[in-house]
């Protein structure tokens, strides 16, 4: 139960990608439907059964993450001008309502990588999840139509 809740929170954090807009081929544009290809929380692999039922949708400055039938919605704010690129995710509806998570992201074609700090205390500085932290590292693949 605790693992499922952490998974929901984690996925809904990553759903936190900000206003992308613009050229869909730009590495700064993260609009689309994204499915987690792999993920780890606190340095440990994320449960496969949860990964398979998770979906992140980003549309402009809005996100929606669904884990099974548990939706989480909110807004994202991107800062692509810094390295690594930054993402602020704020929940507006669901289990993360009124919570803000700081993250970093990078996109390469149809692959999006996001590292979230689920403690909500600081922004990750690298794409790494280590034991004893609440860092959630997810590699997403864009869902094809």
Which functions belong to the PLM regions below?
Residues 20-35:
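N-terminal helix-cap/turn-to-beta initiation motif at the start of protein domains
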Residues 131-145:
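C-terminal partner/receptor-binding element of secreted or periplasmic proteins
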Residues 30, 45, 124, 141-142:
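Preferential activation on post-signal-peptide N-terminal prodomains/segments
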Residues 35-51, 59-126:
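Contiguous, well-ordered beta-strand patches that form the walls/edges
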Residues 1-2:
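N-terminal secretory signal peptides that target proteins for export/translocation
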Residues 5-15:
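Bacterial N-terminal signal peptides
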Residues 22, 41-42, 139-143:
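Chalcogenol-based redox active-site neighborhoods
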